[in-house]
UniProtKB/Swiss-Prot annotation:
Enzyme class: oxidoreductase
Gene name of the record: CYP3
Parts of the chain that traverse the membrane: 26-46
Keywords assigned: Glycoprotein, Heme, Iron, Membrane, Metal-binding, Monooxygenase, Oxidoreductase, Transmembrane, Transmembrane helix
EC id: 1.-.-.-
Source organism (scientific name): Mycosarcoma maydis
Gene Ontology annotations for the cellular component aspect, listed alphabetically: membrane
Entry membrane topology: Single-pass membrane protein
Pathway: Secondary metabolite biosynthesis
Positions annotated as glycosylated: N2, N100, N210, N400
One GO MF term attached to the UniProt entry: iron ion binding
InterPro entries linked to this entry: Cyt_P450, Cyt_P450_CS, Cyt_P450_E_grp-I, Cyt_P450_sf, Cytochrome_P450_fung
Identification of the protein by name: Cytochrome P450 monooxygenase CYP3
Localization per Swiss-Prot or TrEMBL: Membrane
Length: 540
């Protein structure tokens, strides 16, 4: 058997023989040794994939990070605020290495406009995250917002955008009014007309869910829901924790996915199964009502009855639309309103301004009409609340489908982008006194303000993202916030019940959450003198 020396060494290479009978290449090694060798190569390859960072050639500044984990542990419990502070050193756009993924972080309105608007056709897709896409959603649909760009995603977004545009949302106003008044009724009863403090979470969560249910399924949960409300609220919150880009180190260090006791994957799989169970139940019950001719007009019901829509959308795509509708309200509207009622309780001067506007329009204190947003101060309050308590501190991540150049830095296709909407919403150049609650900023129609808007992409707030993958539910969410604020300030004087923190930065329950919400607190809602309570007392 011939042997050859390794170049530059005195060692001999293993014998290389081709076995013509078996067709196997054998390095003078036994079969068991070969198995071990192959396994070692596989593990080494996997390890290298886990520990080597993404494309370090991107010519952008940023923190260096640590071996294997990158900057994971440096980011702390509030990634958005870490990025905002880091931008002071590295600039509005910088890169950060998290595990084996290199992320480009965008921290200012100007930079966001350039990347997400001017390069919008490239930054149109979503990156894949193992725990959410590969485990939790393994046997079910992705939401529209978490789907990579494709013809299927395009069709789903088109269907959702049509169902959630301004005219469509206007047609949902009877539903929004009904659910907002129902929330007022529950607050009135549970708080014993202001004698008892209430924790506001469930009122706005139920309002959000019932609005979504009526709009999407044509039904609402009553007093008895067999635990459906609690199950959906809990599971959607758990799913959101998995969906967050901050959720799991195994999304950035693949080797961790193979640890024998993988609690993250086990929990994610269970949330996925629980979610699939109630989503299937909602769909099948609607399908039954449609077949029996007992359905109410709704988004999914209309799809099921429309032959052309059924041809364009598969069951999985319809499931994706339904899932997006159910989860979106809890993620956005509910958490925004929870913070807002807590803020109003501590700021009676803001309540007085809203109530003065109501009195100017309705001197007899009759029930306000909310079909048009003519209460301009309260309308501005809704926008300001979504800006200052920005629930999505880091928007759903993007990935570019083609190379993008920013300030001479070429960012290759497939790179992950984070839009730091928290930093954008408290940007001092766009928003004067950014940490103050000033609804008046959205009432300024001056030419100078319009110039600032145009320079920064014409986006009023970054609460719903920006560019071609901006949340299509923005009109519905803002209309819900506006309507609820009108009725809350019409019916109640709101006051704190005990001391609590309501600062938008420090009051959050979990700064790493996908959709942040305030730490628990109580408020008292006392009926205002002279206001007719019959619209809520009569609600059954």
């Amino acid at each position: 058997m011939n042997t050859t020396k390794l170049l530059g060494t005195g060692a001999l290479s293993p014998s290389f023989v081709f076995d013509h009978d078996s067709g196997n290449a054998i390095f003078g090694l036994s079969s068991s040794t070969l198995v071990v060798l192959v396994a070692m190569i596989a593990v080494s390859t996997l390890t290298l994939k886990s520990v080597l960072p993404g494309d370090r050639s991107i010519n952008l500044p940023g923190p260096r990070g640590w071996p294997i984990v990158g900057s994971w542990f440096d980011l702390g419990n509030n990634w958005a605020e870490y990025f905002r502070q880091a931008a002071k050193e590295y600039g509005d756009v910088f890169k950060v290495h998290i595990g084996n993924r290199t992320v480009v972080v965008v921290n200012s309105p100007k930079a966001a406009h350039i990347l997400f608007n001017e390069h919008g056709s490239s930054l149109i897709s979503r990156p894949w995250f193992y725990t959410f896409h590969g485990v939790l959603s393994k046997s079910s649909a992705f939401t529209i917002g978490t789907s990579a760009w494709s013809d299927s995603t395009k069709n789903k977004r088109k269907a959702a955008a049509t169902a959630l545009n301004r005219p469509a949302v206007q047609s949902y106003m009877p539903i929004i009014v009904e659910e907002s008044l129902d929330a007022v009724r529950r607050i009135l009863n549970d708080g014993n007309a202001g004698k008892n403090g209430i924790v506001p979470y469930s009122y706005f969560q139920r309002l959000a869910l019932n609005t979504s249910f009526q709009v999407n399924y044509g039904f609402r949960m009553g007093e008895r829901d067999d635990g459906l409300f609690d199950e959906i609220s809990e599971v959607i919150a758990k799913v959101a924790s998995v969906r967050a880009v901050t959720g799991s180190l195994q999304d950035y260090v693949p080797l961790m996915r193979y640890l024998p006791a993988n609690a993250k994957s086990k929990a994610a799989a269970s949330y996925g199964l629980r979610r699939k169970k109630f989503m299937s139940k909602l769909y099948e019950e609607l399908e039954q009502r449609v077949n029996q001719g007992k359905d109410e007009s709704c988004i999914t019901g209309n799809i099921l009855k429309d032959t052309e829509s059924r041809k364009k959308l598969s069951r999985l795509e319809i499931d994706s639309i339904c899932l997006s509708m159910v989860s979106a309200g809890l993620d956005t509207f509910a958490n925004t309103m929870i913070w807002t009622i807590g803020f109003l309780a501590k700021h009676p001067e803001i309540q007085r301004k809203a109530q003065a506007e109501l009195l100017a329009h309705y001197p007899n204190r009759e029930l306000p009409h909310v079909d048009s947003e003519d209460l301009v101060y309260i309308h501005a309050m809704a926008k300001e609340a979504s800006r200052l308590f920005n629930v999505f501190r880091i928007c759903l991540p993007r990935t570019n489908v083609s190379d993008v150049t920013y300030n001479n830095a070429v960012i290759p296709a497939g790179t992950t982008f984070f839009l730091n909407s928290w930093a954008c919403n408290v940007d001092a150049e766009k928003f004067a006194d950014p940490f103050e609650f000033k609804p008046e900023r959205f009432m300024d129609k001056s030419a100078s303000n319009a110039h600032v808007e145009n320079k920064m992409g014409g986006v009023e707030t970054y609460a719903f993202g920006m560019g071609r993958r901006m949340c299509p539910g923005v009109f519905l969410a803002l209309r819900e916030i506006y309507t609820t604020l009108v009725f809350l300030t019409h019916f109640f004087d709101i006051a704190p019940d005990g001391e609590y923190d309501i600062d938008p930065l420090t009051a959050v329950e979990d700064g790493r959450a996908f959709s942040v919400r305030p730490k628990p607190f109580k408020v008292r809602c006392t009926p205002r003198p002279g206001v007719d309570l019959s619209p809520v007392l009569d609600k059954q």
